[in-house]
């Protein structure tokens, strides 16, 4: 399936990319994250397990168990605080 990925803030800076479209067999956010980590290099560092990275699916905050669908939008970003 095709998935649109967007990267924000420090994740965007680490990957030198604001986003990409990928073909994936991943069924969940967790599986997609693992596919990206497996690329190695900046992806492994920016999206590493244990690193504080938040995810959104179709512009709604989601946990790793969220199911992907064809042509969905996934976003990766660091935690954000406000005041």
Language-model segments: what does each one mean?
Residues 1-81:
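Ubiquitin-like/PB1-type beta-grasp interaction modules and other compact soluble beta-rich domains
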């Amino acid at each position: 399936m095709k998935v649109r990925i967007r990267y924000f803030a420090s994740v965007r800076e680490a990957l030198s990319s604001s986003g990409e479209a990928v073909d994936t067999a991943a069924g969940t956010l967790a599986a997609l994250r693992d596919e990206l980590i497996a690329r190695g290099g900046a992806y492994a560092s920016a999206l590493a397990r244990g690193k504080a990275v938040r995810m959104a699916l179709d512009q709604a905050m989601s946990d790793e168990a969220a199911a992907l669908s064809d042509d969905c939008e996934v976003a990766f970003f660091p935690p954000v605080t406000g005041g």
